Amino acid sequence: MHLAFVIDPDRLVQDGAALQRLAVALVSDGVRVRRVLPAARDDAPLSRLIPASTYDFDGSPLFRASRLGTLSSELEEDRPDAFVSFGARAFEAAAELARDLDAGLVAMVSSARELDATPLRRHADRLDLVGASTGPVALRAARQVGDELATVLPLGVATPDGGRTPPPPAEGIAIAGPGRDDGAYRAVFSAIASLMPSMPDLQVAIELPAGHDPGLWALARELRVQRVLNGVTSLESIRPLALACGVMALPEAVGGTRSIVLEAMAMGRCVVAMEDAMADHLIDGVTALVAGERDARVWGSLLSAGLRNPEVASRIGAEASVRTAARFGSARCAAQLAQACETVVRGPAIPFPGAAASDA
């Protein structure tokens, strides 16, 4: 079987490491993989062994057909059996290529926001399957494309080896999120301010991606927490440091999954998150500490428990690690994707559990 992964810039930044592991796992199992990537990228050594083509996702729409035509001609010589898209913009390109080369089409979706931005209905006649990262996202997809075309099919992440203990957590917080909800960040910053007097070494890494609220720094100055904040464009750019933090905080709902959060859970880190109806893997008191409201006292209590209560943090982290490995382990997810694509390419019937199925 020959698969083409079409990966747009947003998903490459967010899930680059997970996608690399997925491709390597599939190749090691005898699946041929070609990647279609943004022109500017920095491949890891193992990824360089996997064939790649480039596509300008950010180019002018006027020349889009020409760019796709050139890519289609390149792929014609070694035609993939199916295109697997990662990201809304990638799906558009994958759908056109699948139509042109008469190949299967699978959309991998990590969040409700990404799902809503993906033009599934426009290419419904070509679409074979939507693989959603969680049960609620799969149910949402099923309302667009039908139950028979939506299933739970997450992108896996690395999990610690059985004999290796993750390094002990540092006295730090990694804040993941788009930085757009002023009320959510006010609650979190206020909670951090309440911790600072008793935690003089506390450091916080905070994402400030494109489109974040420019007033966040003013808010940080107002609440006097700016001296402990360290802004980065993405936690992925400082992955080792982010995963070393004792707590990963999600002030805003992710609306599904995010690889670096799953990696933190797999390592036994304590996740403190805003309530998220699309994230069925974040179970309050079991795999995470979940805040039901944007309240500084609530967040202060949860962050304090994650950083200063070893019994709570270790219990949550241990359960999160076990469940994340069982549900989102990269080897398991690679095997699921291979089986799904094999069915798309060869099958007549699709023996998928459907959108209603989700592991606890």
What are these regions (language model features)?
Residues L120, A124-A150, T159:
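A short, active-site helix/loop in glycosyltransferases that binds the activated sugar's phosphate group
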Residues P214-S234:
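Nucleotide-activated donor-binding/catalytic signature segment of Leloir-type glycosyltransferases, i.e.
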Residues L243-G256, R269:
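Acidic donor-binding loop of glycosyltransferase active sites
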